[in-house]
Curated annotation (Swiss-Prot):
Belongs to the RbsD / FucU family. RbsD subfamily. Pathway: Carbohydrate metabolism; D-ribose degradation; D-ribose 5-phosphate from beta-D-ribopyranose: step 1/2. This is D-ribose pyranase. Its EC number is 5.4.99.62. GO terms for cellular component: cytosol. GO terms for biological process: D-ribose catabolic process. InterPro entries: D-ribose_pyranase, RbsD-like_sf, RbsD_FucU.
């Protein structure tokens, strides 16, 4: 049995398969999921698990060179915005509609139970060397 890191087998598999510049998404429970992208649905009920907890665990296991978030998160969900800013990773902000379009390029979308507005982030894989 695995002792450390992410126990969810689907998330662990996706993270292990990422190459440089591949993307995954951590999403709130309302983000539309493109039909061509794998959805790893963690949602149990509204708010569980929350966006920040999932983001924290994924970032502990993944080298990220860039995060992409909706411009609207700055004003509509300031606490989520602050959590993103606290990560010391470059962030590119784009309008929510553009962010949604960009999710079709992701290897997977991890759906949380988060219900804060615009609590979505695209993580672009970096390299560990």
């Amino acid at each position: 049995m695995k002792k450390l890191g992410i126990l969810n087998r689907d998330i662990a598999r996706v993270l292990a398969s990422l190459g440089h510049t591949d993307q995954i998404v951590i999403a709130d429970c309302g983000l539309p999921i493109p039909s061509n992208v794998e959805c790893i649905d963690l949602s149990i009920r509204l708010g569980v698990p929350n966006f920040v907890d999932v983001l924290t665990e994924v970032l502990a296991d993944m080298e990220v060179e860039l995060m992409m978030a909706a411009t609207e998160v700055r004003t509509e969900s300031p606490s989520i915005h602050q959590e993103l800013e606290n990560r010391q990773i470059s962030i590119r902000y784009l309008p929510h509609d553009e962010l949604k379009a960009e999710t079709s390029k992701a290897k997977a979308i991890i759906r949380t139970g988060e219900c804060a507005p615009y609590a979505n982030v695209i993580l672009r894989a970096g390299v560990i060397f």
